[in-house]
Amino acid sequence: FRSAPLSSVLDARAVIEPSIAAEAATNATPEMIATLRRHLAEAEQRIEDQPAFAAAYRAFWEGVAAATGNPILALLWPALRALTDSGGFIPSADYRTQLVGRMRVLLAAIEAGDAAEAAAIIAALDSEFARRLTASYPERMARPLAWSEVSIDGEGP
């Protein structure tokens, strides 16, 4: 990663993820939307169980990326999230509840085929996320990325 700090991943996400959300809103099939609904319901049911919530949350976002219909984007979004997860950030149950609400709003935009709204939702979410992590974890955000800390499957390095 050539000494790239974790904050650079959030910068990349802010550029890339709104476009992915817009593509998902444009290209999602009814089957993909049904899959997103299932992952959202699972995340909502698992808010108090962080590992189970994390699995459903990750599956939802992988589903959004898959809904673009572009296999590169379908791989890129989970990879960016795996890099972010290498920071070891564990959201509280209250924050997980907020995330489910945002996932629900995004799903509505995708279902409506509203690419601009889907992009705006993700841009706002990424911006808030970056501000929160930078304020709460400045040392982690400045720390260079290391492959040894990245897990694509969400099970940890």
Where are these regions (language model features)?
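All-alpha effector-binding/dimerization core of bacterial HTH-type transcriptional repressors
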Residues: 1-63, 101-124
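C-terminal all-alpha effector/ligand-binding and dimerization domain
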Residues: 40, 44, 55, 79-157
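Cytosolic histidine kinase catalytic core of two-component systems
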Residues: 31, 71-72
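Short loop-to-helix capping motifs
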Residues: 69-71, 113-114
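Phosphate/oxyanion-binding loops and surfaces in catalytic or ligand/nucleic-acid-binding neighborhoods
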Residues: 23, 67-70, 83, 128
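Conserved catalytic core of Hanks-type protein kinase domains
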Residues: 15, 67, 79
